[in-house]
Amino acid sequence: MSLFARRTLLSSACAFAFAALWGTAAAAAEPIKIGLVTALSGQSALSGEAISRGLQLAIDEVNAKGGLLGGRPLELVRRDDEANPAKGVVAARELIYKEKVAVLFGGLDTPVSMAIVPLVNQEKVPFMGPWAAGTPITKNGANPNYAFRVSAVDETVDRAMLQYAQKTFKSAKPGMILVNNPWGESNEKGLKSALAEKGIAAAGVEKFEAGDLDMVPQLTRLKAAGADSLFLVANVGPSAQVVKSLDRMGWKVPVVSHWGPAGGRFTELAGPNAKDVHFVQTYSFFGKQSPVGERVIKSLVAKYPAIKGPGDITPAVGVANAYDGMHLAALAIAQAGSTDGDAVRQGFYKIASYDGLIKSYKTPFTAANHDALGADDYVWAQFVDNRILPVGLTTN
């Protein structure tokens, strides 16, 4: 073989080896995409931003440790659902089919998540709910079921709402004022069940549309029926209208709410009596923090200039639920050893423990239970000077 031929052969071999190595490195560095469909505009935009921050913080931590599956970084891809189920499904389809996300996260609105869940079950893409609490999101009847959640669950919240109203306000005849959508329906069912378990009759059940501006007629009927407390289920805008309607009536009645008011500009929209609404949360950055909590606060302050302390981390549940949900999803992917949807789904069941922000999780998911949080993880809160604080806590 001539010198030229040997050099040509050697050059070709080196080029082939380089290409193979480059291809392997490129594959190893290919991002694992994490999708998010949530409200990023409108009255509930703060909820979407909180979820985004919790996810990104967890993603940063995973990537700082070398990523997953041999060095692949996680990458967040967001889409705005505008709190609209149809737009949420369109966004989810894009993230699943075009972006090829390994896990899809949802947002605040139960109707949007409930519209997306059939799609993820069909396409075998794991779904993680960091906020929407509708019971049927995870208990959807699908087998296999790809929907998981790190958040409150309506049927559990409803029992907690009744217990809180009885203990805090000595309520014996609560009334319900609910948004007329699947989330309201989920809570109507749960509240009626909780009341039946205690042998209590509701003063009445009243509903309103999400865009209604005047709930005085419904509230007047509940007052006439003798309601001594109100169970409120609605997101930011309509919850604020309920408070303003109570103001116009001059009716001072305890309001025990699901966590809808925490999702946006509630104090701005509801006025000074926003402080009188007590609502459920899954976490607060106020008070004594665990080492994980202290680390998360420090990281948020460093990453986001607008955050100076706990009062600026709002809504806290969006950050906390998303943070823990992302770390659990990362553990599931690691357990799966790939981004295959069914393998990741089964990977969630293989998580033995995780020392999280909200709590230390022990076997957070099983085939029979796709909800990682329970009643013991709830905190009751209210607005104090535009800050969400645990009830009774007035200082940082």
Language-model features, listed with the residues they occupy:
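Extracytosolic ligand-binding ectodomains
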Residues: 2-7, 12-14, 27-396
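N-terminal signal peptide c-region/cleavage motif recognized by signal peptidases
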Residues: 22-25
